UniProtKB/Swiss-Prot annotation:
Topological type in the membrane: Peripheral membrane protein
Top-level taxon in the UniProt lineage: Eukaryota
Encoding gene per record: atpE
Disulfide bonds: none
Name by which UniProt lists this protein: ATP synthase epsilon chain, chloroplastic
A GO CC term assigned to this protein in UniProt: chloroplast thylakoid membrane
Record lineage: Eukaryota, Viridiplantae, Streptophyta, Zygnematophyceae, Zygnematophycidae
Length: 133
């Protein structure tokens, strides 16, 4: 039994496939989805989605959004997403280092919030590209 997964950003369909298991970062923590999961609508945090297709795991960096599951159909609407295979590891590490420095040097509430979001995005991309299964 499988789940039909569809990940959509505002300007494109990021990914469509069948999956045996999905692990997501929701606003209330990590959640795992298996076939025949109860209907669910949840907000997603910036983080890595892990998808198992047959016995192979794949990582996707999600930049926040919503996930809905019903009748083994999972639809994920995100602000942006990148498959790990599309991320340059060197560029992801450089972006993470820069975001970490900016976060540590942030002054004031607005700058701290913006730096924190940039840091979370960079961290998600780096975790996705470095995921080992």
């Amino acid at each position: 039994m499988t789940l039909n997964l569809r990940v959509m950003a505002p300007n494109r369909t990021v990914w469509t496939s069948e999956a045996q298991e999905i692990i997501l970062s929701s606003n209330s923590g990590q959640i795992g989805i298996l076939p025949n999961h109860a209907p669910l609508l949840t907000a997603l945090d910036i983080g890595v989605m892990k998808v198992r297709i047959d016995s192979k795991w794949t990582a996707v960096a999600l930049m926040g959004g919503f996930a809905q599951i019903e009748n083994n159909q999972m639809t994920i609407l995100v602000n942006e997403a990148e498959k790990a295979s599309d991320i340059d590891p060197k560029e992801a590490q450089e972006a993470f280092d820069l975001a970490e420095t900016s976060f540590n040097q942030a002054v004031g509430r607005k700058q701290t919030i913006e730096a924190n979001l940039a840091f979370k995005r960079a961290k998600a991309r780096l975790e996705a590209v470095n995921a080992k299964y």
